[in-house]
Amino acid sequence: MLRYLAVIASILVIVLLVSSFSKHETADEINAIARKGNRCDSHKQVSLQDPKTGIDYTIIFCDKTCEHGYPHTINEKTMMIPESHPKERLPITVEHEKIHLLQRRYPEIWEAWYKLLWSYKIQKTPPAGMPKELLEKRRFNPDTEDKPFTCWRGRWWSIAVYTSKNPESLADTKIVWWDEKTGQITGEAPPEWSDFFGTQPQDEHPHEMAAQMIANGAGNKNLREKLMTVYEKHFYRSNRE
């Protein structure tokens, strides 16, 4: 009997592993389709030091097709900005991406702020009950990929998904919300979230929300000021010297 149960358990484990692999493979395939024709060749690069925080960083100016023209970070020190990016937007864009560099360098600090200030948690793996249809169509974001799954108040999960299994670009996406308590999937943030955060230009992940608040001055004023206070106190050189 025990031997029989052991065999059944082994089969279940194999089925779960295959299922998990299939989900990730499908998401990988869809993201590859969305990025078809993308080239991220480096055309020019400059290395700088941020006068406010003191961090060293590198800007790589790349092909306009890289991530379909979306600026992004690739590691703790490097941001990629397409050469076609509007020059008048470059200063704010660099500030935005510098926040992502700091998020990569000091993940524990940012996660603590998200939990304390916003009741958010982020994690590397999806929750057990997240629908397969969302996981298979999930859009990968280089700036959030270390821990892409986000939950607000232990219940609501936001995720960027492609609108089809054959997307023409990274722009063919929408933000959907999954309610872990009820299982409902909606295209709008829960009313409680909207009451708390107000209008957010990028609501898929706290990393993007934080970068928008600090660099772009977006979002709820009170929340933005609270975040700016802890951010400046912790990262500004003038407050550390």
Describe each PLM feature range.
Residues 40, 88-89, 93, 201-205:
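Soluble non-cytosolic domains of exported or imported proteins
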Residues 1-20:
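Single-pass alpha-helical membrane anchors
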Residues 59-68, 111-127:
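Acidic helix-start/capping segments at beta-turn-to-alpha-helix junctions
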Residues 62-95, 99, 104:
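Active-site scaffold of zinc-dependent metalloenzymes
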Residues 58-60, 103, 108, 233:
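Non-catalytic terminal regions of proteins
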Residues 115-241:
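Metalloprotease/metallohydrolase-associated module, dominated by Zn2+-dependent proteases
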